[in-house]
């Protein structure tokens, strides 16, 4: 499937040099933009290009344009503020370039994230009326408890959460925590994936991970079955 790469330059107050944010764009002209945010230090493509493959899968299913980004750590900048601000910057870019990215000047946004990326989404989604659905995979508390609680309390769209029952980083209980906090959501769903760790390792769990956005954004109720999923890795 087609994709293009661009670099956004974000100015940082008090810093001589700004940040360069690489975006990978998988285009579709249906008025929907799906923004993907990986975990902390997560590469834009992920292990074995799993995020690129997942984006292609979303594009193939005609869910929307996919915009991918990395989640680097900067020693000279405060964490988690820079992680949150980078994501906001990319969302703002998507909204201001909606026609170019999605074929619609005022696009609908779906947000999906993993671990710290999911935490960031939980914190900021409620600030954007254009965001209709969010997918939180193995969500962590990296964005800060207060930010997550306030963010989810404000969000009135659809919330989809999935985590492995053997998650050794955030624990399967994180899914229930985020579910309980999303008490303003129009729809909220939680799926605990059996025999699955934090990274969704293994061919079966990779296929399940590939189907998570189909469940959240396209109503695929076969999730978390791996059947029909895309092989992301062995």
Q: Positions of the model-derived regions?
A:
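Alpha/beta-hydrolase
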Residues: 36-37, 137, 193
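Alpha/beta-hydrolase active-site loop
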Residues: 77-102
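Short beta-strand/loop motif that positions the catalytic acidic residue
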Residues: 155-156, 161-163, 167
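Short, surface-exposed "cap/lid" segments of acyl-processing enzymes
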Residues: 16-18, 24-70
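Short alpha-helix in the alpha/beta-hydrolase fold that links the catalytic acid
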Residues: 49, 148, 157, 171-181, ...
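C-terminal catalytic histidine-bearing segment of alpha/beta-hydrolase fold enzymes
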Residues: 77-81, 176-179, 184-234
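Primarily recognizes the serine-hydrolase "nucleophile elbow" in alpha/beta-hydrolase
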Residues: 93-154
């Amino acid at each position: 499937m087609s994709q293009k790469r661009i670099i956004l330059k974000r100015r940082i107050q008090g810093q001589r040099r700004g940040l360069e944010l690489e975006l990978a764009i998988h285009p579709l002209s249906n008025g929907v933009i799906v923004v993907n945010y990986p975990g902390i230090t997560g590469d834009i493509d992920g292990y074995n290009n799993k995020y690129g493959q997942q984006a292609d899968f979303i594009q193939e299913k005609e869910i929307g344009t996919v915009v991918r980004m990395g989640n680097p750590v900067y020693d000279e900048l405060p964490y988690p503020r820079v992680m949150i601000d980078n994501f906001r910057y990319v969302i703002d870019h998507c909204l201001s370039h909606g026609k170019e990215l999605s074929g619609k000047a005022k696009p609908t946004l779906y947000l999906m994230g993993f671990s710290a990326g999911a935490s960031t989404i939980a914190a900021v989604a409620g600030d954007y009326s254009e965001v209709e659905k969010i997918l939180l995979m193995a969500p962590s508390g990296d964005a800060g408890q207060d930010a997550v609680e306030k963010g989810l309390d404000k969000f009135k769209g659809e919330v989809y959460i999935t985590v492995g029952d053997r998650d050794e980083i955030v624990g399967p209980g994180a899914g229930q925590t985020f579910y309980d906090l999303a008490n303003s959501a129009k729809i909220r769903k939680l799926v605990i994936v059996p025999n699955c760790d934090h990274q969704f390792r293994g061919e079966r769990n990779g296929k399940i991970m590939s189907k998570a956005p189909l469940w959240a954004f396209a109503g695929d109720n076969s999730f978390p079955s791996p059947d029909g999923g895309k092989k992301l890795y062995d």
